[in-house]
Amino acid sequence: MTLASIRRGYHVIKTLLQYGLDDVLPPKMTPWYFKLARNSLFWIRNKHKGKSGGERLKLAMQELGPVYIKLGQMLSTRRDLLSDEWANELAMLQDKVPPFDGALARQAIETELKAPIESFFDDFNETPLASASISQVHTATLKSNGKAVVLKVLRPNVEAKIQADLLLMSQTAKIIDYLLGEGNRLRPSEVIEDYRVTILGELNLKLEALNAIKLRNNFLDSDALYIPYVYEEFCYPRLMVMERIYGIPVSDIAALKAQGTNFKLLAERGVELFFTQVFRDNFFHADMHPGNIFISRDHPENPYYIGLDCGIMGTLSEVDKRYLAENFLAFFNRDYHRIAQLYIESGWVSEKTDLQAFEQAIKVVCEPMFNKPLDEISFGHVLLELFRTARHFDIVVQPQLVLLEKTLLYIEGLGRQLYPQLDLWQTAKPFLEQWMAEQVGPKAMFKKVSTKLPYWSDKLPEFPELIYDNLKLGRKLLSSQQQMLDKYLKYQQQAHKSNYLLITSAILLICGTLLFNQDATLWSPYVCLISGAALWIIGWRSRPKNRKF
């Protein structure tokens, strides 16, 4: 650990203590020697005793800077780990930081382009359009066609700063893991690893550009979603250039009302977009918070979404998708036994889990949800409560499902903000049922066979040779097994013979010793002893030497 990381660690601990976050730790983590060290190294008092633990954590992360703000935002989606009170506070963290110098942005852009900005762009504005913890955005026009574009560039030295903070977080998480011991539900190392993967993915703008291109191609003819065009020839790990858009922020409800937006259609399209991305394309935008979503200004009666920032994308395996769809359908059919089975069959919880106990725990959590109308039930909270319940049965955390849960909560919250009467179930159920029918029906089977047919046709001429090779290999295995069996039987016979001789020799030696004390003929003890010794030597030397078969 470097001196700089030690200083940073001291600053982080000091900040957390200033907000009295040691007060919320369990007693086993604050023994007398912890309190002694705290008072010796940090002459700090908690000045925020009137605030809740969640609010204090939010303020501390806000003060610690961008990396911790993003960590807090991620933690706000892990409601399977945190209480709603803490999660709601962290959700209010805003990734807004002062912009860095426009001259530095110009320098960073020209380093990536290996040419002056004016070689490719006109009207470059050194005053940023937007600024965040990892990057900031500048406007310009393309010299080749005059189209308006935005240039997204990483902050100077941001990678080194993030790596240093991640190392510190990882080391701290390991210490907390050790203190809490096995079986703790917080699992800090797991949380930090999820965060590390997420934030490092955001540091590669070339990857973000490729994600945006793929998502755009998936929705080229869509009336519901528009992804701005990416100029791939100008995209690098630290620079991304894309079409400039002029939509209305989805959070600006007043502006959307003023232009006469069809809120019902917009909310329903948001739900359809989510399920289309997950179940049709298996490629979903996993960072759909309001800052990344805009609404079209044209045709407010037929509005569409504009999606930005494709740095965090999610995918699911075919198995995950099937089990997820079945989970939702089983929940709304109140089939808790099937839900428990699905969690075990999918490998999300151990196969050793007590099925009846798990089913009962799911029923206790889910049954009260049906006390309210179906249109008020939240898909995201259903998934969340199921994960929370599974936590008590040692669920194997699936990062892709955590991303899905976060995205679903965003989409639901957004949909009900736009149109409070949104019936999520009625919107999603036909989609889920159609997808399930396509996966398990005759058409699905025919499609899978058709997909595999070219491969089988290509391999068909090789089948006779493969059969011959397998038969030949089988004969070799049988011959090898027979040889091993013969060796084993021979070993057993030798061992049996040796043991018989050793036992007999032991009996003769014991008898010879006893006869010395009895009224026996003079030669009897000697015969027994000599015979016993001879048999012992023969038995010992006849022991099988090699146990390898």
Curated annotation (Swiss-Prot):
The keyword Kinase applies. It holds the Pfam family ABC1. ATP binds at L129, A130, S131, A132, S133, I134, S135, Q136, V137, K152. The active site is at D287. One of its GO terms (biological process) is ubiquinone biosynthetic process. PANTHER family: CHAPERONE-ACTIVITY OF BC1 COMPLEX CABC1 -RELATED, PROTEIN ACTIVITY OF BC1 COMPLEX KINASE 7, CHLOROPLASTIC. Is probably a protein kinase regulator of UbiI activity which is involved in aerobic coenzyme Q (ubiquinone) biosynthesis. This is Probable protein kinase UbiB. It comes from Shewanella sp. (strain MR-4).
